């Protein structure tokens, strides 16, 4: 058994959380670079919490420049067991409206300019991301959303685009009509893959702000409208977070899905051939198996 520690990665419009006891902003050093910001730690209804604003307070990092590896490594160093991503997204469905939330369970990764793995030359590893989110943690998020009175859709495919520009009409139509995606965003990849490499349970909550550019009745993405919707979504997200402790146990056994054992047989490089410099950087992420 280990103590549950929830790590919240807040996206656009969500730069802190309410109700923490003994709140402290901590600067965490990482060999993978400087995290997006200091991490807010404390307890919420007896459960240890950590909050990291993905873009930094004041929104200083674009989706492409977010230090994803440093962020996940820093949360791991803090002892986080469960990572919940909350991010602003567009919708590809009339049924998924602005103000709704989607508990994402699949991704299509279209990012092109980001470091997507902790591993590489000197220590090669291959983890499975067939099911990239944790079912147990996603269910807890769904229950917390319902408790907050949020319209939350259970399951959906997230198209991760590079950005920072929004989609063209042709791209939006492709993702919706041909690929069957449900939502679109710019930040959950490689974040979800890195969380899996770090043996962290990961869940993704998409806060819907717009219809991307496919919808004939809504036109192209309007940043002013996004910001307006974000304010309401952020308040709802904070309410959802306040319900999380009631949906999760303070101590947990091994993840039923095996998220916490994802590196068990993943490293292929022979021990005598592993690069010491890379192994030193992997002390938190892969220390259990190294």
Give short role names for the model-derived ranges.
Residues 186-224:
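Zn-dependent metallopeptidase/amidohydrolase metal-coordination segment
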Residues 213-261:
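His/Asp/Glu-rich mid-to-C-terminal helical/loop segments that flank catalytic regions of hydrolases
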Residues 147-182:
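Active-site/ligand-binding-proximal alpha/beta "capping" segment
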Residues 1-131, 287-290:
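Metabolite-binding pocket within alpha/beta catalytic cores that recognizes anionic/polar moieties
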Residues 76-79, 176-177, 196:
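Non-catalytic positions within long, well-ordered alpha-helices that form the structural scaffold/packing
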Residues 136, 140-151, 239-247:
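Generic non-transmembrane alpha-helical segments
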Residues 253-290:
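A short, charged, Gly/Pro-tolerant segment at domain boundaries
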């Amino acid at each position: 058994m280990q103590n549950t520690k929830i790590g919240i990665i807040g996206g656009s419009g969500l730069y802190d959380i309410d109700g923490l006891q003994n709140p402290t902003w901590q600067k965490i050093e990482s060999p993978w670079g400087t995290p997006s910001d200091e991490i807010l730690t404390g307890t919420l209804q007896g459960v240890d919490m950590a909050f990291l604003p993905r873009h930094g307070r004041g929104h200083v990092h674009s989706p492409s420049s977010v230090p994803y590896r440093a962020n996940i490594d820093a949360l791991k160093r803090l002892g986080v067991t469960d990572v919940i991503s909350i991010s602003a997204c567009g919708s590809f469905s009339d049924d998924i409206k602005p103000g709704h939330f989607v508990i994402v369970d699949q991704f299509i990764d279209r990012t092109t300019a980001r470091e997507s793995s902790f591993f590489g030359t000197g220590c090669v590893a291959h983890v499975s991301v067939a099911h990239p989110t944790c079912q147990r943690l996603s269910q807890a998020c769904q229950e917390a959303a319902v408790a907050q009175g949020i319209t939350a859709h259970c399951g959906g495919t997230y198209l991760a685009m590079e950005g920072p520009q929004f989609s063209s009409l042709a791209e939006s139509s492709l993702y919706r009509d041909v690929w069957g995606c449900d939502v679109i965003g710019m930040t959950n990849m490689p974040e979800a893959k890195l969380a899996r490499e770090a043996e962290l349970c990961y869940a993704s909550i998409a806060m819907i702000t717009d219809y991307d550019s496919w919808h004939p009745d809504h036109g192209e993405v309007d940043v002013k409208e996004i910001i307006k919707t974000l304010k309401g979504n952020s308040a709802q997200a904070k309410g959802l977070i306040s319900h999380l402790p009631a949906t999760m146990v303070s101590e947990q056994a091994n993840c039923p899905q095996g998220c916490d054992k994802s590196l068990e047989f993943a490293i292929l490089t022979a021990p005598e051939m592993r690069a010491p410099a890379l192994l030193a950087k992997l002390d938190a992420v892969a220390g259990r198996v190294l």
